[in-house]
Amino acid sequence: MEFSVKSGNPEKQRSACVVVGVFDRRKLSSAARVLDKASGGALSTILRRGDMDGEKGQTLWLYNLPNTLCERVLLVGCGKERDFDEPAYRSVIATVARTVNKSGAVEAVNYLTDLPVKGRDTLWKISQAVTITQDSLYSFQQLKSKKEDTQRPLKRIILSVPSRADLLPGEDAVRVATAISVGTKLTRDLANLPGNICNPTYLAEQALQLKKTYKGLKVEILEEADMEKLGMGALLSVSRGSEQPAKLITLEYRGGRKDAKPVVLVGKGITFDTGGISLKPGAEMDEMKFDMCGAASVLGVMKAVAEMMLPINLVGVVAAAENMPDGKATRPGDVVTSMSGQTIEILNTDAEGRLVLCDALSYVERFDPDVVIDIATLTGACIIALGHQATGLLSNHSPLANDLLGAGKQSYDRAWELPLWDEYQEQLKSNFADMANIGGRPAGTITAACFLSRFTKKYKWAHLDIAGVAWKSGKEKGATGRPVPLLMQYLLNKAS
């Protein structure tokens, strides 16, 4: 899909399709009014017939509109003008993408970017239009024998800007948003693959492929023998029951000053999670292929950053393993020693994500990081607390937490902060080791982060629990690509 920006009146566009908005009670948007005037009131006449009243999500195709140069016009209902906010804008952009893609038009000029959205400027609207369009048209068909392709898929979208002065900033917004979409697509593709394809070795191969594509990337892969030498007993306890060897994958991108400390991202990469000996219920266990979405998001961010050549130093670390039950698997009650030297009583082998993360969090001390952010589908408790709307955020550094919350609001990939109070640490006490790997049912998301916080004393750290946002279930089952937009906005802000 190609995107560009353009300034000009809708009636003068030689295109397969021009898209304009109509608000509730048939109120025309500014671009629609221009078309109406040029066509001698044809739009108003058609709307008065009752085919459309402007309700959000409605669409109406018009062909051969008088005194216009386009083949067809798509009217899109935007709802009440006073209520046209970020969710409404995102919703109508998605509607346009799907509707035009099915129409056979290969090109469209979209004037919805001219609509006023409360608190948002033109560049935000352009960026959102690019990413939402790409997300809406995403289709995972790699494993299907027959592809369900559109006969004439949409190839180009031209986004309207108010004036010629907005063209250069608009093109830059398109460039950045396109790179984010490329990274998000990689994240979704990796997460949607089944565990018999996407195992730890496959993730390592994908990192090496990124290195080939982007010459500025360095990649290092630690094998189990390397991790054994480093004392990563927690991480290795997870892969013990699997025939698939664990991998610790590091990607380095140096686009900033040589003396600038890097941002470090750490992704949980459990490529399939049966729960181990603490076996999960069979229902919906297939969705545990998504337990590597944190790792997939790290790889997606690395790709997006390299694609746009962002002036920042960034390290991505993927802790990859498969959690399976067999005769060699870790048992409930086993005690292991982490890379930090702290001992852990594993009361539940299904709380394995924190075990791979804690050793990775110790490992990243060697990079002398500015900040460390881990991303993990860590707890079902986060879904109970926040549902499927917000990423859970916990941090030992308030400014970092605020920066991430702000980036979430900017990108509309939102997060919500939960407390990391010392009182919750009491739930992790063990009679047989320095700590237990679970803290009971109460505050499960918080106690999981409390566990991780014991391995992050030497740097500023934030934890993103994406269990509720990384994938969808049901009819639309599949990975969402979150929180790539949040992380990219954070990095863009930091690099500016």
From Swiss-Prot:
The UniProt keyword set, sorted, is: Aminopeptidase, Cytoplasm, Hydrolase, Manganese, Metal-binding, Protease
Task: Note the InterPro entries from the entry.
Answer: Leucine_aapep/pepB, Macro_dom-like, Peptidase_M17_C, Peptidase_M17_leu_NH2_pept, Peptidase_M17_N
Q: Where does Mn(2+) 1 bind?
A: 273, 350, 352
Q: Could you give one GO CC term from the UniProt record? A: cytoplasm
The source's superkingdom equals: Bacteria
Q: Which reaction does it catalyse?
A: Release of an N-terminal amino acid, Xaa-|-Yaa-, in which Xaa is preferably Leu, but may be other amino acids including Pro although not Arg or Lys, and Yaa may be Pro. Amino acid amides and methyl esters are also readily hydrolyzed, but rates on arylamides are exceedingly low; Release of an N-terminal amino acid, preferentially leucine, but not glutamic or aspartic acids
* GO terms of biological process kind: proteolysis
Cofactors (names): Mn(2+)
Coiled-coil region: none
EC number assigned by the record: 3.4.11.1, 3.4.11.10
Per the annotation, which location comes first and is thus the protein's main one?
cytoplasm
Residues recorded as binding Mn(2+) 2, renumbered to this chain, are: 268, 273, 291, 352
Active site residues according to the UniProt entry? 280, 354
State if Iron is listed as a keyword. no
What is one Pfam family matched by this protein? Peptidase_M17_N
Q: How is the cofactor bound?
A: Binds 2 manganese ions per subunit.
**A single GO molecular function, which one?**
metalloaminopeptidase activity
What family, per the record?
Belongs to the peptidase M17 family.
So what does this one do?
Presumably involved in the processing and regular turnover of intracellular proteins. Catalyzes the removal of unsubstituted N-terminal amino acids from various peptides.
Q: Which HAMAP family match?
A: Cytosol_peptidase_M17 (MF_00181)
Please report the name of this protein according to its UniProt entry: Probable cytosol aminopeptidase
